[in-house]
Each structure stands twice: as structure tokens, then as C-alpha cells.
């Protein structure tokens, strides 16, 4: 056998077919069971390229037993417990998580270069004016929830509208958004090699979309039940 390291040996100049295409590295996907505000303090300024977040915004019903909030076609929100609490999409809750305060938004803007905030119309006191909002047409029909959801963005482009195109099965979180919505957001607003942040991971749709798109991702979820559910959902997807 010839010594291929001998300088007198001429190697073939043609590269084998399998070596012509360099396979992309598998994107990292790190999620933590942790309070996001405390966690963000560990990161340097502008550590993340794009934050896509869906914070809660103080929705509760009170203690009216068996009270139907929605009198429409689907009755998506219904009182279910004698001391209060309600159901959304099959999930029983006492109330939706408390809305984030000024400290949260201060840290969010510090650690990320650009931001997309779902429910931005509820947080106008924390967000600067923007010309670029995203409107997601959920095509809900007759029920308590709005026909659309709005997302504030830090970008300077025009308002964009996304229509519901598919109904995803396997709902694991009451405010779960579909993967295709995050697919679209990443295609429109993220750049190659961007590091994506989600402070309220919930169902993990953003995580799956980032993995599909080849983006490195960091997410936080404070609720252990939802953390475990999204972890299973992500691993099942992989």
C-alpha cells in the first residue's frame, strides 16, 4: 500500500461526492425550568439576536361557579370549580400567569437585539411605538377570544398579517400557538445563525420551529408540568 503522506504521491483532485456537501451542524436547543427574569440577568447585553416571546397578561374570571364566559359556538372558556377557575382548550386553570412587570421588559430589551412580543397591545406602557406589528388571524368564529392576536415588533417594516392555515392536534398548553406561525416569523425576521430566545416557552412551538429552521435556541418555562410536556413534544418531533 502506498504511503499517502509521501510528498511524491499524487492525490486525486476530484472530491468524492459525499464530501462535496457539508452537512449543517445540528442547532443547539437549551431550555430551563426557571424564572425567566432571574435567568436573564446572567446574560450579557445583546446576547440574543431575536427574542420571540408570548407573556401572560392577567386574564382571570373570578369565583363564579359554572359560568360560561363564551356564549358562542365553542364555549372555549368555562368555569369548572366551585371556588373559581376555568378551562381553556381542555386545560383547567385558576388563572393565567401574572403579567410581567417593567423589570421583565427592561431585561428583555437589554439581552436581545430585536424583539417580537405577542399580546403587545396589552403591554403598550412597556413598549415603544412601532410601525411593524404582526396580526395573526385565528379565524376563531363565535367565542370569547378575539379573532386576531397582535404581536409588537422592534422592526421598522410594514404591518404583516398571517392567516390560520392548519389546525394542529395535540394541544398541551392553554395559549398554545401553532408551529407554522413561528416558522413564518423566523423566515421573515430571523437571519442565518441568529440565536433565538423565548422567555415563556409554554407548549414549545417556538423551540420546534427554531430547530426546524436551524436556529440555536434558548427558552425558559417556570411551570414544571408545561416544561415536561414541551420536552416530550420536542423529543417526539426530533
Region locations from a protein language model:
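Class I S-adenosyl-L-methionine-dependent methyltransferase catalytic core
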Residues: 1-197, 205-238
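Conserved glycine-rich SAM-binding loop
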Residues: 202
